[in-house]
Amino acid sequence: MSNAITMGIFWHLIGAASAACFYAPFKKVKKWSWETMWSVGGIVSWIILPWAISALLLPNFWAYYSSFSLSTLLPVFLFGAMWGIGNINYGLTMRYLGMSMGIGIAIGITLIVGTLMTPIINGNFDVLISTEGGRMTLLGVLVALIGVGIVTRAGQLKERKMGIKAEEFNLKKGLVLAVMCGIFSAGMSFAMNAAKPMHEAAAALGVDPLYVALPSYVVIMGGGAIINLGFCFIRLAKVKDLSLKADFSLAKSLIIHNVLLSTLGGLMWYLQFFFYAWGHAPIPAQYDYISWMLHMSFYVLCGGIVGLVLKEWNNAGRRPVTVLSLGCVVIIVAANIVGIGMAN
């Protein structure tokens, strides 16, 4: 395995670790509605940071974006909006299925759809099947899916042992939402694929290869921001128990506390895709679809590790922890299989 591919896998791991941890600051926010908290963090992660980073990277910010036709920008934007819909469904999936089953089904579907649909859309899936390296990477995707399933099973055992139940368990409704979440969340993978002309244009302007994907986030996350912020603002306006004015009428010190924590959560959310771009850069072009598989499987891996570090599994007993550890090992093996396949 080449050093470049190894570093690509490493940066995907760092990005996934940030994704697994980003919600921790949000949990410390006090006396704010979820909608206000999510909006403040979202403005930072989906608007301020993508625009600021792009302004630093590009020699002429406006000239870069105005150089693209609507036919180039619109698919990127719409796939970003597609991801935004999946993002909202994610929370509802947890509500009706519980954390473990919800995450397992949603992540499993988005891993498959986001990883395999890209080469199918590009018309080169047959090349993957017909080459040794391609077959190896596809095997890695299958092993990663097995690893996600094992970690999901560990979560179910933990919830059963600790008496944790879904907020409003509804299998039929939860499964529909999980499938929708999995499919729509893959929009981020499709957006990255559609944004290749933007990456190439950034490279032509002299942007470092590690950073060429970052300017496209202005458009991708702009689509996601409209969906997420629109959802939050509509609820803040329509739901009687929610009030943006009330949330910002608290003591000044508490408002500052909440804004800082929401900003930190937004920064950590953005960093997952900052490092996703770094991890994506050294991946060979014919295997760029693998980036999504690495990100999602590492997200599950890091989520399990973070849970152990935060002692969330202390009262779960030995069996759930053993199953979790097995799942984490399987995901690590999957990453190595994919790396070897890409090296071939």
Curated annotation (Swiss-Prot):
Q: Which InterPro entries match?
A: L-rhamnose-proton_sym_RhaT
Q: What is its main location?
A: membrane
Organism (species): Escherichia coli (strain ATCC 8739 / DSM 1576 / NBRC 3972 / NCIMB 8545 / WDCM 00012 / Crooks)
What gene is it encoded by?
A: rhaT
A single Gene Ontology MF term assigned here is: rhamnose transmembrane transporter activity
Which function does this protein serve? Uptake of L-rhamnose across the cytoplasmic membrane with the concomitant transport of protons into the cell (symport system).
So which domain of life are we looking at? Answer: Bacteria
One Pfam family of this chain: RhaT
Q: What is this protein called?
A: L-rhamnose-proton symporter
Q: Which residues cross the membrane?
A: 4-24, 38-58, 68-88, 101-121, 137-157, 175-195, 214-234, 259-279, 290-310, 323-343
> What Gene Ontology cellular component terms go with this record?
plasma membrane
Question: Where does this one sit in the cell?
Answer: Cell inner membrane
The record gives the membrane topology as:
Multi-pass membrane protein
> Which family does the similarity line name?
Belongs to the L-rhamnose transporter (TC 2.A.7.6) family.
Please write the reaction equations for the catalytic activity of this protein.
L-rhamnopyranose(in) + H(+)(in) = L-rhamnopyranose(out) + H(+)(out)
Q: Upper lineage ranks?
A: Bacteria, Pseudomonadati, Pseudomonadota, Gammaproteobacteria, Enterobacterales
- Mind listing the UniProt keywords for this protein, alphabetically? Cell inner membrane, Cell membrane, Membrane, Sugar transport, Symport, Transmembrane, Transmembrane helix, Transport
